[in-house]
Amino acid sequence: AGEALREMEPDKRILLFSRSSYIGMHRYGGVWTGDNKSWWSHLKLSLAQMPALNMCGFLYSGSDMGGFGADCTEDLMARWLSLAILIPLYRNHACTGTRLQELYRFTHLDDFKKLIELRYALIPYIYSEFMKAALRDGMYMKPLSFEYGDDPRAFEIEDQILAGESIMLAPVVEQNRTGRNVYLPEEMKMIRFRAFNDYTEEI
């Protein structure tokens, strides 16, 4: 399909992604992680899958936000949306027969709106860092240990990843949690980052 699209539209960039894949397919498009479930364990798994897919060359990747199968709760959807803010493939997708999970069906619409606004505010960063990785045969999403190789603790952290050169993603991935502990390597500076117009005040 990728070769056919390039032949039909040689002067245009194409957007192509698939569930099935093989090594080398990243030259033609991206991949999503398949039919996941609306489970907290799958939310955490999707965080681990992003660097793994990047290592195989798949920079354009992502999971079905909220999970594809089973019934998504509002809390799980909010956490998935938060995790996915920096992930290139950003889509809510669910199976027929599961609870409808379009964002407008939940009660905290204002919270979802703010998350989506933040996503849109970050698109220039995502695009810039994504293209840097693509042009340099690098990774857009990577484990802490790839950047902080001299830090033994960085090798133990599996629920925080780097998105581009300047942002670390450390989402809440457990049910009934209002926060989490975050490991900051010594060279890293933490800044407040809560809304699309609020990312300069140091804490």
Residue ranges and their predicted role:
Residues 1-203:
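Catalytic-domain carbohydrate-binding cleft regions of carbohydrate-active enzymes
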